[in-house]
Amino acid sequence: MCGICGIVGHQPASPIAFEALRRLEYRGYDSAGIATLTASGDIERRRAAGKLDNLEHVLKEHPLPGTTGIGHTRWATHGAPTENNAHPHEAGRVAIVHNGIIENFAELKKELEAKGRVFRTETDSETVAHLVDDYLGQGLEPREAAFAAIKRLEGAYAIAMIFKDHEGLLIGARHGAPLAVGYGNGEMFLGSDSIALAPMARKMTYLEDGDWCELTPDHVTIFDMTGAEVSRPVQDLTFMAGQVGKDGYRHYMEKELHEHPVAIGQTLKRITDPASKRIALPEMPFDPAQVPRITITACGSAYYAGMVGRYWLESLARIPVEIDVASEMRYREPPQPDKGVALLISQSGETADTLGVLRSLKKAGQSIVSVLNVEHSTMGRESDLVLGMDAGPEISVASTKAFTAQLSVLAALAIDFARARGTMDQAREERLTASLLDLPSRAAEVFTRTKDIQAMAAVVAQARDVLYLGRGICTPIAFEGALKLKEISYIHAEAYAAGELKHGPISLIDQTVPVVAIAPSTILFDKTLSNLQEAKARGGRILAFTDAEGAKRLEGVAEQVVIMPDVDAFVAPILYAIPVQMLAYEVALLKGTDVDQPRNLAKSVTVE
């Protein structure tokens, strides 16, 4: 959600911090700010509500000097998105930036106000600055004051601090929110993730929960919550800064939509053997044949990927699967079987609710398998096995290529489990694997249908409400389509299994409601067709994604059809996800919304 950065070195800190904040825009924000130490040792800061362009204007009018600094993009949780509530927050001799929620801030604030401290914002984060400054006032040095303060914080936080009269010193801390150290040449950095650090550093360390660190231009010292010095792995950054550019596209989302074929292909390359047409996943830390049940949990689009994964695992591997959104699973505490497996899905590997479920299921004795795009994330480090995607950085808030990469991994996992459990022979495995390996070329074909999708978008863009329908394994793709439309076009959309139409949603259908159908000509096509005829009879405008055979049978029913490449029904959900995402993008263009940074949304939801 919020993005933070810190710089300590010998170059001007403000421009570096600003560019880091640019790269953190994808996380979602509503205000931003930077603070630096001047040559005289004073703290100066600049803040602005709204987009980074507003902060850039302020910085041009009033530049910030100094080689030590911190920056922040804020996604409001406590207090309105105003300049006054924007970070960095300053109290006496310290300035801080914070990502997370301080759950005991009210108690700490009351204590500090009793000492005469005056709070100037509505945020929980300002409490951290006052608490650190209070300890500085008691004679503690910055490192000691920071440690004393963070030991009293409850909740989730990633924090960076600078101190008056201490140029060349930067302190960071994390608990429940991501923070990484970047190593430069005579300079050190803090950042919410590797994307923030990529241009400045080529090596990095992810801090672990409870870690805090002291950075100078030439040295990094990491401590745990006992105050003991600890060592954490140093790793190369996995991508270069150029990978997060738009490369001539209008939006990151447009670029990432066009990267579907590559993301699918690179992901499959890691987990298949093209020569033998067989799946080649890493060795499992358990015997798949002995697993009594799989529990899948995720949030947002990753949850819909999990829904498709459930279909595959149940039908191919004949294994019971439970699935729930992480925010519910975390507090539901269902009984878990011995030798059970928890399958968690996350693009970032930092999703707060999913991470909470991971820890509770691990405590319950479940083996943890995570499907991640960022393998060295917190979830990756805490999992028993990581099935990594290779989708590359995804910057637009609305997930696109990561979704199809997740589906590709889940399809391979289902085949792997089926082989191990004896529910699939080699011939069928080879056929299904071949259909997966054919996907990148089929995905590339989808973009030749752009004009048809744009024509469909012209209808959807005029609507206030849109209904998405799917059947069987394509039902989750209807949910994905409705979510994308809501996220980036701000048009209300709902998705249903087509068979549920008569159980309520049909009462909403009239000539103002487009009905978007995900309808490949599988064995369930006849039933979907019947439901679409019912919707058309009530005045609904039928828009369909189908194949050539389906298009013939939809003549006279569908107003518009996007004819998809013919593929095996097994991989249809992966392929059909692409045009429903493209439809949302084209509608958003017509509506003139902020495609990459839709209002109120954040890319990486690192707080509950």
Curated annotation (Swiss-Prot):
Localization (cell): Cytoplasm
Main location: cytoplasm
Active site per UniProt: 2, 603
SIS domain boundaries: 284-423, 456-598
Taxonomic superkingdom: Bacteria
Domain Glutamine amidotransferase type-2: residue ranges: 2-218
Pfam families: GATase_6, SIS
A single MF term (Gene Ontology): carbohydrate derivative binding
Keyword annotations: Aminotransferase, Cytoplasm, Glutamine amidotransferase, Repeat, Transferase
Gene3D superfamilies named among the record's database cross-references: Glucose-6-phosphate isomerase like protein, domain 1, Glutamine Phosphoribosylpyrophosphate, subunit 1, domain 1
Function summary: Catalyzes the first step in hexosamine metabolism, converting fructose-6P into glucosamine-6P using glutamine as a nitrogen source.
Protein name according to UniProt: Glutamine--fructose-6-phosphate aminotransferase [isomerizing]
Source taxonomy: Bacteria, Pseudomonadati, Pseudomonadota, Alphaproteobacteria, Acetobacterales
Encoding gene (name): glmS
